[in-house]
Amino acid sequence: MALLQISEPGQSPNPHQRRIAVGIDLGTTHSLVAAVRNGAAECLPDAEGRLLLPSVVRYLPQGRRQIGYAAMDSRSEDAANTLVSVKRFMGRGLKDIDHPERLPYAFVPGQEGDMVAMQTVDGVKSPVEVSAEILAELRHRAEDTFDEDLYGAVITVPAYFDDAQRQATKDAARLAGLNLLRLINEPTAAAIAYGLDNASEGVYAVYDLGGGTFDISILRLTQGVFEVIATGGDSALGGDDYDAVLAEWALQRLGIRAESAQDKAAARIAARACKEGLTAAESALFSARIGGNEVRLDVLRGDFDAITSALTERTLAAVRRALRDARLQREDIQGVVMVGGSTRMPQIQRAVAAFFGTEPLNNLNPDEVVALGAAIQAHQLAGNDPAGDMLLLDVIPLSLGIETMGGLVERIISRNETIPTAKAQDFTTYKDGQTALAIHVVQGERDLVADCRSLARFELRGIPPMAAGAARIRVTFTVDADGLLGVSAREQSTGVEARVDVKPSYGLSDDQIARMLQEGFATAGEDMRARALVEARVEADRMLMATRTALEADGDILPPGERQSIDVLVQALEAVREHEDASAIDAATQALARGTEAFAARRMNRGIQQALAGKSVQSL
């Protein structure tokens, strides 16, 4: 008798066909790995039942190393070989690191554009290699849990990570032996864990307050489509700042000062413990050994809330900016997802609830929520959930464009554009007979190339010689789902094409991105004036070049008086071009254009006469 195979709808009847895929939160201080088990996402523990893996690697002689808790215990005794928080160095050069002399590492100077590296007893190590060690440790944990090889992983990155930092993360995954299914933004992963689990739709805010940074993302969920419509934050604000304020306040109340680095560290540690105590109680003890003496102070939650209220307000200011970018009011937000251990502070919970007029979603562990969301996405990308129809649309943190004549930026893809995306724009040549075009790809919010960041340069050659402005070159920008950029240029008539994949050797820090955004807002008026001046000068140069070329070729057809008038207009434009008045340059350019209209008509008539010379009416 034949037996029928029965399985749950949407699931394979063969359990061995299930692909093991995990989500990884590669964090600055701690990392986690999660997977969907028995229909629910959960973080995977190590052999001792611990979920968090400290993002620390210690290198030892003869190729030996310690990872995680074992390495963390050796930070003080072997600081030079114990590499901590290397996520901050991913995709960054040595010149991008603030005060490298204050860090215990022996940084290795490299070529301009090289990613920073550190000298250890086991040789020179890059942040990519260190991150790969952490990823490999998490991969082994997952494989031990399931007793089989992984199919792939989804890894989360900060929303502000640029091309170089994302590429460095992809390289680390490959080095760790992981099949990278996708990179997704951390707030997006958190939203997946909440929004999809609860079958919610609408507009949501993801409020992510970690130890060192604050990120806010505005997302729209509609029929399974998750779209990030705005991002923002403060890369110099986190739980550590709350610790610092509390430590300084406590020492002032005690009437003492922390002079040495050891005393300052002790005060910070005591402040953090006190802050964590105030999460669950109305008062907690600040206790530290300062200057060889034990000091103690009872701290009330109300005092802590009062002295740190300015920090909390800074997070809300960033939220307001993100809402403006999304063109939304706070009343449009259906729910708020809380991410990061610092959101456990009661004052944060109250402030967010009061701002949005709704209680934030906090039923998931804020330390784990990012990894859980990544696991859900990995589960679907591995094909284990055919019924899942989720689509993620992240956004670009800074505008992308190319340099045009005069050092101006022509934006192709604007900030907060959803990805993956592709945008194209047509350009032309500036000079007669131009057969090549240099493409300079830049990133930023300013109007001048000098104020933006250079990403790549390449050339399109083989353009047919034509009059200036006749050629048509289509420049196409494509950004994939991982946020990596490709740029191509194609001459339309011949099909000749050139392309570059933008993988800069190091990228922008969160601080630099935030600074570039702030400068873009603060200098908008100045940039508009500068752009108008440059555009006026470029048009003046084009008009002067065309006039000189025409005079050299056909100046003999001009009556002496008309030639003199044109020369006067040319001299006037040349003189005013050196001034800083865009409107005056425009006026002089238009005057020259009007003054050469009759000359242009005579040139056209001569050209027609030359073309018809020697031909009969019948032959035409």
UniProtKB/Swiss-Prot annotation:
GO terms for molecular function: ATP binding; ATP hydrolysis activity; ATP-dependent protein folding chaperone; unfolded protein binding. It comes from the Bacteria. Coiled coil: none annotated. One of its GO terms (biological process) is iron-sulfur cluster assembly. It holds the Pfam family HSP70. InterPro entries: ATPase_NBD, Heat_shock_70_CS, HSP70_C_sf, HSP70_peptide-bd_sf, Hsp_70_fam, ISC_FeS_clus_asmbl_HscA. SUPFAM superfamilies: Actin-like ATPase domain (SSF53067), Heat shock protein 70kD (HSP70), C-terminal subdomain (SSF100934), Heat shock protein 70kD (HSP70), peptide-binding domain (SSF100920). Keywords: ATP-binding, Chaperone, Nucleotide-binding. PANTHER family: HEAT SHOCK PROTEIN 70KDA. Belongs to the heat shock protein 70 family. Chaperone involved in the maturation of iron-sulfur cluster-containing proteins. Has a low intrinsic ATPase activity which is markedly stimulated by HscB. This is Chaperone protein HscA homolog. It comes from Paracidovorax citrulli (strain AAC00-1) (Acidovorax citrulli). The lineage of its organism: Bacteria, Pseudomonadati, Pseudomonadota, Betaproteobacteria, Burkholderiales.
